[in-house]
Amino acid sequence: TENIASSVQDTGGLYFVPAFSGLAAPHWDQYARGMMIGITGGTSREHIVRAVLESIAFQVYDNAQVMEQDSGYSFSVMKADGGPVVNRFLMQFQADILDAAVDVPVVTEMTAYGAAFLAALAVGEFDSIEDVRGCWKLGKRYEPGMGRMEREFRLEQWHRAVERCKNWEIPNRR
């Protein structure tokens, strides 16, 4: 998907909201439904793939905003892990939308790695959680490069799309 998404300059105005069983945090709407909006005669497979990948970054942005508001802490770096981190397009777009660096570790499956470290800590292989923290190694850092106006426009369009999919399902009407 990385090469497909990178083959077009943008989504051509297409936005994808993956609300297959409603929207979770921070929108909390069980009646929202997934949608793709902005389809035109010029919409291509590449635009669709890119819109789907961008939707992941937009969702992370929305949740990061809530975390910043609730904690009062503004972050300049986000650490990412898991399968999606191998997609360089997605990680760069994530940095652009967050307007923050995104750090990807050498070991991308940190959930399993973390569970192993906690088990090792529990049996005394490490003296403290600080020893475990020292095992995290940076694989790649993605720096934001999108201009403020472009970022704000894309976020505004994303939020318009999210609002349109809310309350779609009418309860007890099937």
List each language-model region with its residue ranges.
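Glycine/Thr-rich phosphate-binding loops that ligate phosphate moieties of nucleotide
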Residues: 1-174
